[in-house]
Amino acid sequence: MEIISQYGSWLVWITAVFGFFMAFGIGANDVSNSMGTSVGSGTITAKQAIIIALIFESAGAYLAGGEVTQTIKSGVIEPIQFVDTPDILALGMLSTLFASGAWLFIATKMGWPVSGTHTIIGAIIGFACITIGPSSVDWSKIGSIVGSWFVTPVIAGILAYAIFASTQKLIFDTEQPLKNAQKYGPYYMGITVFVLCIVTMKKGLKHVGLNLSNSETLIISLAISLIGMFFFHFYFKSKIFTQSANKGTFGAVEKVFSILMLLTACAMAFAHGSNDVANAIGPLSAVVSIVNEGGKIVSGGALTWWILPLGALGIAVGLITMGQKVMATVGSGITDLTPSRGFAAQFATAMTVVVASGTGLPISTTQTLVGAILGIGFARGIAALNLTVIRNIISSWIVTLPAGAFFAIIIFYVLRTIFN
């Protein structure tokens, strides 16, 4: 309590800086890898990807604002355990932010796509273990997270393999690929819109009071997907499409999948912004709340007005200044991508997110996407995969939790020494 009463304003300022650093890391790594397939496949340029990501990530982040004050969303520890030592929780959140930002910065410099959520969970584990003991951590939750490293990439890889194989059989390996793309394209579009609507309503819009039942979500998604399917049925048959496409070439076919891929990338960026923004501003909100309440730990309350813009700014700066490093790894480092291959990977990721949301399986979008890209590579043969890059990526996943914990412990001791 003494630290909060004496240094409350300093804690808020320092946490704001650390929160910006964490948001910077999310923008440079998490957001960048989600747009990597679109850039690597040639669907859009890196500059266009940055603009699209900023628009949809920011939109998702602002819609998430009302729920972010639930701070430690991971469920790894319960804040109530710090009710008698709020100053320890405040320093712990400071440590968590800096540690997570530091690991994301290092991973980005190395070109490793890692999970921001897993990074911050590792950091929370680190400071919790040295302050209130290992028993305070919900280790079953950690077991589920570790299990997801294997389960979700495999699911996404299998789905991506199946989607890619279907496009080859129905479209690319036929005598008239463009005609078949016009024939089957609307069906791919309808299925894509159906899944993306579910992702948006269940993941992206759950923070704005849109409490739809599963049946309502399915009905609305089906209706929108049917509208989309009919629209693109006429679009692919129209002169606008046929004149812009170069008939008889695979480039014209790939244009169909470019549209699908762009839709998927926008929807996933929106869902990511509405959920993962809490990784940066959740701990920041916790410290501000503790200071404003004079040391009391509250579970709800209004979000201070400047926190969301700070998080959005940090994500934007990180994406613009360092985003292309991870984009390159995801977009071209693992395997060569075309719009059809990139769509298969992005769509498989979206489908896996839907499955995980329905089953409660903890999921990293980063790891899911990488698993989907691996599935595409396997469909083309093992020689199509860059095994060195894959080895480095998997190693970085394994290191992420302990790295977050290690940095958090170091920073916590430094901060405690300074403020004591």
Swiss-Prot record:
One Pfam family in the UniProt entry: PHO4
One of the GO BP terms on file: phosphate ion transmembrane transport
Record flagged with keyword Transmembrane: yes
InterPro entries (alphabetical): Phos_transporter
A GO cellular component annotation in the UniProt record: plasma membrane
Gene Ontology MF, one: phosphate transmembrane transporter activity
Major site of localization recorded for this protein: membrane
Transmembrane domains' residue ranges: 8-28, 49-69, 88-108, 112-132, 145-165, 185-205, 216-236, 250-270, 300-320, 343-363, 370-390, 393-413
Keywords: Cell inner membrane, Cell membrane, Membrane, Phosphate transport, Transmembrane, Transmembrane helix, Transport
Membrane topology, as annotated: Multi-pass membrane protein
Keyword Acyltransferase carried by entry: no
Localisation: Cell inner membrane
Lineage: superkingdom: Bacteria
Function: Potential transporter for phosphate.
Family stated for the protein in its record: Belongs to the inorganic phosphate transporter (PiT) (TC 2.A.20) family.
Name of the protein described by the UniProt record: Putative phosphate permease HI_1604
Organism in which the protein naturally occurs: Haemophilus influenzae (strain ATCC 51907 / DSM 11121 / KW20 / Rd)
